[in-house]
Amino acid sequence: MLDSVASKPELAELLTLTKTEQILRLAQINVELEQLSAQERVKWALENLEGEFAVSSSFGIQAAVMLHLVTQQKPDIPIILTDTGYLFAETYQFIDQLKAQLNLNLKVYRAKESANWQEARYGKLWEQGIEGIEKYNKINKVEPMRRALREQNVGTWFSGLRREQSQSRAGLPILSIQNGVFKFLPVIDWTNKDVHYYLEEHGLSYHPLWEQGYLSVGDTHTSRKWEPGMSEEETRFFGLKRECGLHEDDGSEQDGSGI
């Protein structure tokens, strides 16, 4: 698959190019990746992209799909969770459930300051508008994830982002480069129906809060149940933003666009 597009050494060379050069070189590969199934995409990535590999997961509503999809081909792949300390009790229970069911190699990373210490220093950042939310996300999600990628020596990062989830994800490619790491999104073009059928076929569950009306689940204080007329992205961060920062490039010219 895709052998005519780029060899493994040629793919590795992409990491040395500027962002613009990376995007141009990756465009042709992405055209062909779009023609493959999610399982074929994962197989290609494991055979051709830079290791070590890892999957990031928030253990959200549809998390079981990506965790199952990738561990079927690489059972021992590290699963990185950034634990803010403010997850729902049901999320922690879901983590334990999937860890046992799929025998996950779970790696948990947290902020260097505890949740209580952060509140003592900064107050409740999530109540301080967009700037407070961005600071909260940087402390609790972005820094721990970058530390995880560094400590796990990750060369290729798998994520379960889907274009259908929000406008900010609608144009994402399957393969990109984010902050010097290959970013691979094998289910980026899946619909909610595709997700549902996969879960049913493989005996997997939605997050427990799915049945209570949640379409997206993160921290307790910035996740809302869906109500008629709301988009999925409006159920997070009070509708002020969709992304927590994990899947945003740092903006440097050397790194490609990117969980």
Curated annotation (Swiss-Prot):
Catalytic activity: [thioredoxin]-disulfide + sulfite + adenosine 3',5'-bisphosphate + 2 H(+) = [thioredoxin]-dithiol + 3'-phosphoadenylyl sulfate
An annotated Gene Ontology molecular function: phosphoadenylyl-sulfate reductase (thioredoxin) activity
Catalytic residues, chain numbering: 244
UniProt pathway: Sulfur metabolism; hydrogen sulfide biosynthesis; sulfite from sulfate: step 3/3
Subcellular location: Cytoplasm
Superkingdom: Bacteria
InterPro entries per the UniProt record, alphabetical: PAPS/APS_Rdtase, PAPS_reduct_dom, PAPS_reductase_CysH, Rossmann-like_a/b/a_fold
GO CC terms of this entry: cytoplasm
Top enzyme class: oxidoreductase
Presence of keyword Oxidoreductase: yes
GO biological process: hydrogen sulfide biosynthetic process; sulfate assimilation, phosphoadenylyl sulfate reduction by phosphoadenylyl-sulfate reductase (thioredoxin)
Keyword vocabulary terms for this entry: Cytoplasm, Oxidoreductase
Enzyme Commission number: 1.8.4.8
HAMAP family: CysH
Purpose of the protein: Catalyzes the formation of sulfite from phosphoadenosine 5'-phosphosulfate (PAPS) using thioredoxin as an electron donor.
Family according to the record: Belongs to the PAPS reductase family. CysH subfamily.
Protein name listed in UniProt: Phosphoadenosine 5'-phosphosulfate reductase
Protein species of origin: Vibrio campbellii (strain ATCC BAA-1116)
Gene: cysH
